[in-house]
Amino acid sequence: MAIEEKLESLTSRHAELSAHLADPTTVSDSKRFAAYSKEFSDLEPVVAAWQAHLAILQQLAETDEMLAEAGDDAEMRQMAREERETLKNKLEQSQKHLHLMLLPKDPNDDKNVILEIRAGTGGEEAALFVSDLFRMYGRFAEIKGWRIEMLSSSATDLGGYKELIAMVQGKGAYMGLKYESGVHRVQRIPVTETGGRIHTSAVTVAILPEADEVELHIEDKDLRIDVYRSSGPGGQSVNTTDSAVRITHLPTGLVVICQDEKSQHKNKAKAMKVLQARLLDAQQQAADSQRAEARKGQVGSGDRSERIRTYNFPQSRVTDHRINLTLHKLDQVLQGGLAEVVDALTAHDQASKLAHLGGGD
């Protein structure tokens, strides 16, 4: 079986690394020693789980042998059958655990996140829902122990946002938010509606892993940086100094604007973070498109134009269309209670990846 062969191969590699780490020539080479140590550490839990799995198989074989030798001893046979049932359950759990450990890890999972929320169809109502979603993610971040900071925003007169960009910092931020990319649809009676009719609006969410400098090098010659006075809702000037920053990446035409800070330097630093994340995301999207076939069964396509979720206020309903999950607890979700949705999406994604793994893909 392909999975067993993979586990045996990893066990052999673990033993090799153990020998390398005991070799004085490796110890004297700090770079190689660090690389081997990390690989050894990553393999340690997998190998330990595989050894435990083999031990259960051995116990099961011994129990079968005991059952065969029990003869007419009813008490012995009953005891062996009970032990066998317990071991079979343990084996099943062990197998699931091993399969999950073998799933390729997303290298972005522990990264910070650039969160971008933009109003789509629906005008002012869509802009207000941008504000609602930002509040939801802020409370979810608080529950998870993450820090959220607004980097840039474009406010409207009624308190909504045409666009909002924020940084979410904390362990597992990308892992917890990566399934949020896509179109979020809201159905409710807008505050501006006098006839009591339900309107449908849409908001687009993009979740980008923060780019490390080592992953992405941007040449100064590829940037055009413009500074100007920041403006508020309606276009009125809110600052008397040239603190707003617009950075254009000339090779791609990507433009990032930051004006929320009073300091030009802070706005520039924030704009660079957003630009780096967008460029890294563009690289990864291009790479992902080459692996599109392998991603078909996974949760959503990650396509920003994909409608992923509907928030229906009259029915207090949240529906995630990718996994056909419906919850009648809209208020709880908007208060940051996203865990149930995220857990269901994660489980679905893992199940589809396990199906590929089991098929030897």
Curated annotation (Swiss-Prot):
Cell location: Cytoplasm
InterPro entries tied to this protein: PCRF, Pep_chain_release_fac_I, Pep_chain_release_fac_I_sf, Prokaryotic/Mito_RF, RF-1
Similarity comment: Belongs to the prokaryotic/mitochondrial release factor family.
One Pfam family linked to the record: RF-1
Organism: Magnetococcus marinus (strain ATCC BAA-1437 / JCM 17883 / MC-1)
Matching SMART domains: PCRF (SM00937)
GO cellular component: cytoplasm
Cross-referenced NCBIfam families: prfA, PRK00591.1
Residues modified to N5-methylglutamine: Q236
Region entry Disordered, spans: 286-306
GO molecular function: translation release factor activity, codon specific
Function as written in the Swiss-Prot or TrEMBL entry: Peptide chain release factor 1 directs the termination of translation in response to the peptide chain termination codons UAG and UAA.
Maturation and modification: Methylated by PrmC. Methylation increases the termination efficiency of RF1.
Entry annotated with the keyword Repeat: no
Record flagged with keyword Cytoplasm: yes
Keywords in alphabetical order: Cytoplasm, Methylation, Protein biosynthesis
Stated name of the protein: Peptide chain release factor 1
Location (main, coarse): cytoplasm
